[in-house]
Curated annotation (Swiss-Prot):
The lineage of its organism: Bacteria, Pseudomonadati, Thermodesulfobacteriota, Desulfuromonadia, Geobacterales. This is DNA-directed RNA polymerase subunit omega. GO terms for molecular function: DNA binding; DNA-directed RNA polymerase activity. GO terms for biological process: DNA-templated transcription. Its EC number is 2.7.7.6.
Length: 68
């Protein structure tokens, strides 16, 4: 597999800080036993898997106003 870069992920998520939050949340999910949404035969670490999922468009986020 090709290397995943921050630039690949920023095509899907506009903000670097949001990217970090999204990736860290996904890493926690993977650590707790969630199944990867991409092929992980290379036994990549959870951080790499989460970034690959974001770059592939398998994971995203929505930002909206908080309701009361």
């Amino acid at each position: 597999m090709a290397r995943v870069t921050v630039e690949d992920c920023l095509e899907k998520v506009d903000n670097r800080f949001l990217l970090v939050m999204l990736a860290s949340k996904r890493v926690k999910q993977l650590f707790k036993g969630a199944r990867p949404l991409i092929d992980n035969r290379g036994a990549n670490k959870n951080v790499v898997v989460s970034l690959r999922e974001i770059a592939a468009g398998k994971i995203g986020c929505e930002i909206g106003k908080k309701g009361r």
